[in-house]
């Protein structure tokens, strides 16, 4: 069991904003903890994008998108620079897989990579891979369900580039 020493000594997580980049515009939110398991919307802003800046989830014009992010950030009034961004659903491959529950963390990572190579139509060095253990399998206590997610590295790198160009830390 991990101990959250920051919470133990009264330190909170650093403020973070969420960014949604779509073909029509940028949406920015900042949520803050307002109680146990409760969040409050602290800031929100949206900014339109010129036609063609983002097409089918692909960032086509980094300058236009980063400028819109910077305008939304300024308009929101937030001071947070740490940003979390999602990927467009069409750019992400997800697959629920079953793995043995006795695997170590390192063994789990290796097994996920092995399994991913069966489901991802790209070389693994071309993708960003992530996974999350969902829980144990109902009728098989020796197994666990794992959600696997993968997207092309270039898609992630484009989103990181626009956030950094806007002065944020993705």
Annotated model-derived regions:
Residues 1-170:
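Hydrophobic/aromatic-enriched cytosolic interaction surfaces used to assemble or bind macromolecules
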């Amino acid at each position: 069991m991990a101990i959250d020493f920051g919470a133990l000594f009264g330190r909170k997580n650093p403020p973070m904003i969420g960014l949604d980049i779509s073909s029509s515009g940028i949406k920015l939110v900042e949520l803050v903890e307002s109680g146990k398991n409760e969040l409050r919307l602290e800031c929100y802003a949206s900014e339109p994008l010129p036609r063609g800046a983002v097409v089918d989830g692909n960032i086509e014009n980094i300058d236009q998108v980063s400028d819109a992010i910077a305008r939304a950030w300024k308009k929101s009034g937030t001071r947070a620079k740490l940003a979390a961004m999602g990927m467009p659903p069409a750019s992400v491959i997800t697959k629920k897989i079953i793995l043995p529950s006795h695997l170590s963390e390192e063994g789990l990572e290796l097994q996920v990579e092995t399994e991913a190579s069966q489901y991802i139509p790209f070389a693994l060095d071309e993708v960003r891979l992530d996974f999350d253990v969902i829980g144990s399998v109902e009728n098989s206590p020796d197994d666990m369900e794992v959600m696997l997610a993968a997207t092309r590295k270039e898609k992630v790198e484009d989103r990181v580039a626009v956030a950094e160009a806007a002065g944020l830390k993705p």
